[in-house]
Amino acid sequence: MISYSDTILSSPQRGVFAGSAALLACLLAACGGPSTDAPSSSPSSSESTALVIPMEGLEKTELTFGFIKLTDMAPLAIAYEKGFFEDEGLYVTLEPQANWKVLLDRVIDGELSGAHMLAGQPLAATIGYGTKAHIVTPFSMDLNGNGITVSNEVWEKMRPNIPSMEDGRPMHPISASALKPVVEEYAADGKPFNMGMVFPVSTHNYELRYWLASGGIHPGFYSPDDVSGQIQADALLSVTPPPQMPATLEAGTIYGYCVGEPWNQQAVFKGIGVPVITDYEIWKDNPEKVFGITAEFAEENPVTTKAVTRALIRAAMWLDENDNANRAEAVEILARSEYVGADADVIANSMTGTFEYERGDKREVPDFNVFFRYNATYPYYSDAVWYLSQMRRWGQISDSKDDAWYDATAREVYRPDIYLEAAQSLVDDGLADAADFPWETDGYKPVTSDFIDGVSYDGRQPNAYLESLTIGLKTSQTVAAGEVIE
């Protein structure tokens, strides 16, 4: 049950007052009245002389958005706190949700207008894996932001298998090959090696699987008649809601997990576990969350959808501008109970350009959370195809699909057309710099091998990519009765 105190209400009145203040400042300057001497700069999300006038024809102005208590919900919190929703004439209510399934179901049922979603959720829903519904995304919320944590006991067993730097600290990135002997030891003792991830179609599931497989540990297959994801598995992965990860680890129910922040850093602060790798080290600048809405909502409310996307773009710009200068304020906002509700020091440990592995081993990781730079907010088709490829790799997509299917599905869900229309309007209004957006892209990023195993990924050739991966289903394979069939 979500209490009223956990719900954040937004009113356009603040935006009206802000707009009035901006207008007054402009009039004073034009009339030779008081002004402040300040260096000129390119338009930014948080400081602009442009007067924001809500778009005409908003189909809906009262909206409710859902989120899970993770730091990467930040664009929603900032769009609210900085009045960017209000600038668009939108009354927004933000509501934390109990888990990812509840969040998705409430978007589908129309109880939520949209939500902070796992990147795989709109894709899985659209192809009918789990609840069937056509969900689209006009906005990618962030890059990176996750980590994999193991218990202290497991870490002590892994540590001899990890090379050290001259100062004695472990060398990163840490391969899952260091974990493999530990998993084998547990198996020999008759103990299943249980690990947690947040949802079957979560980034965390696919990142954890990718890391394990790259180190020779089989994370298991799915099949139409067995959705546990544990067929032929060396490590048994199961769902645990993000805020419950540390407690579940401490209880010994799981030996490790993959989750977003602040729940890896929480394990460090509590002294119950050690984050061994970040997803930045698994796949550099990987897409993480998206903002999801139903296709019906986007079709029936195009002006409102554009206005929401504008507000979220401005929030992302604010989060990354001036070399993350606003992150300390963002941490203070996110620490509030109505948002993430974790200790500010815990959130700051990853949100402000550092990441702590073992207690005291804090390292510079400036791109652990990226919200705008590197075109983080653009919904790339190639990102969608990667998630679909992982669904196929592990059997969630049970049958072979040709490359054209992957492309068509990506285009059905990812909506860069909406994103670019919103971005262009911000540029036209003097609120954004045209150079910050990828106008000429076809939606596919260049081929990259920035993965922990060095395997190259070309979003235009998903089947060739699947064939190149050592562990996982190949193009012609399927899973039935617990066996891989050619």
Annotate each language-model stretch with its function.
Residues 27-30:
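C-terminal motif of bacterial Sec signal peptides marking the signal peptidase cleavage site
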